[in-house]
Swiss-Prot record:
In-chain residues carrying the UniProt-annotated modification Phosphoserine: 46, 51
Entry keyword annotation includes Phosphoprotein: yes
Protein family membership: Belongs to the slowmo family.
UniProt GO cellular component terms: mitochondrial intermembrane space
Protein name according to UniProt: PRELI domain containing protein 3B
Lineage of origin: Eukaryota, Metazoa, Chordata, Craniata, Vertebrata
Amino acid sequence: MKIWTSEHVFDHPWETVTTAAMQKYPNPMNPSVVGVDVLDRHIDPSGKLHSHRLLSTEWGLPSIVKSLIGAARTKTYVQEHSVVDPVEKTMELKSTNISFTNMVSVDERLIYKPHPQDPDKTILTQEAIITVKGVSLSSYLEGLMASTISSNASKGREAMEWVIHKLNAEIEELTASARGTIRTPMAAAAFAEK
């Protein structure tokens, strides 16, 4: 078993970061996630948003890893459960693979919460527990997978910034469009009065 942890601070408020987290895929930084299906989404009586999603991923595994695990297939599936608490301002996301579970398990947990000293920033705490079962060189493979997770976490943070930029651009476009819509009738009314 290998445990990997990380902490990152986003220079954006919690509301922005959690909105981006829900819209993170697809993105050009991590093209291995090829599909996201929402299986269930509901708000509980306390106002928390619960989501259960299925992520389809396509991994380019090195041939040595394919031969060690005895699989040519590289499409894998991950189930993801998240809970967004708008009152406490926390988002907890847990994911686990549902493919190749007889050989490997990757359990990941992400927590997003406002920075305690700066409400315009968000802290992401990330942890992954990797367990390779029943193959020789399991500790080597666990280390290799931890390295891949670390690299993908970096890509994930880049993707979050990309989504946030995209969301901000959409907001600016909508705002400009709304201003134009408001000004047009006002301009027409002013023109009609002359």
